[in-house]
Amino acid sequence: MLVAVVLPTYNESENIARLLTQLRNVLPDARLFVVDDNSPDGTGDIAERCAREMGGIEVLHRPGKQGLGSAYRQGFAHVISQGVDVVVSMDVDFSHDPLVIPAMLAAIEAGSDAVIGSRYVNGGGTKNWPIHRRLLSRWGNLYTASVLGVKVRDCTSGFRAYRATALASIAPETTKAEGYAFLSELVVRLSRRGLKISEVPILFVDRENGTSKMSGRIIAESMLLVTRWGVAHRWNQAKSFVQVKTRERKS
């Protein structure tokens, strides 16, 4: 099974070399693809050095900060074009433990089309989070799942493994969201297509080095888009119901 790991980066100079080393130890044959948004702290240069030293690493240098969704769209398209079997996405700041990846790959081999590293299934959780952040994240995920009608407990986790054919089938290159709303948009598409989504427990550890990319603007954007998608979904359901009843009355 050929695995590719897509790693969006922006100012992760304190983390990138150590993460690439750990990934190479956990997944000796995987292809590692770094998508760097012209990090001022030299993240891209460090990734290039690792590529020369370790092999099996590609680095895409983008001209500026273009967002998480954009980075994943470009990264997914690149690795899918290489004919890989599984695509893994994850954060670079060690919030996501590379040692969990084998369990995610095992779930893919067992028949899942997508596997989410989940904070909100039995055995999962968070570490070093203040209470307000835990409550906000939990509420946000409950709201997202309820509004969008998806049976996923952690819609916003970026730690995932996708069967490459399943990922390609939902056309991620046509998604519109940026920021963390992009992750929810993928969950919606997977669910609407009837693909099998499973969740494995993870302990999400707050970053020790670097600066978080999360902001109030990103959270607001995510909630607004989720609400918009939910309204559109309910409207389409209502229209379908009316159309069915109309046909029944005519028959």
Go through each PLM region and give its residues.
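Hydrophobic helical membrane-anchoring modules
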Residues: 1, 149, 172-251
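N-proximal low-complexity "stem/linker" segments adjacent to membrane-targeting elements
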Residues: 1-22
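Acidic helix N-cap motif at the loop->helix transition within catalytic regions
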Residues: 14-18, 41-50
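Short, acidic, metal-binding catalytic loop of nucleotide-sugar glycosyltransferases
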Residues: 21-30
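A conserved acidic beta->alpha catalytic loop
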Residues: 36-45, 94
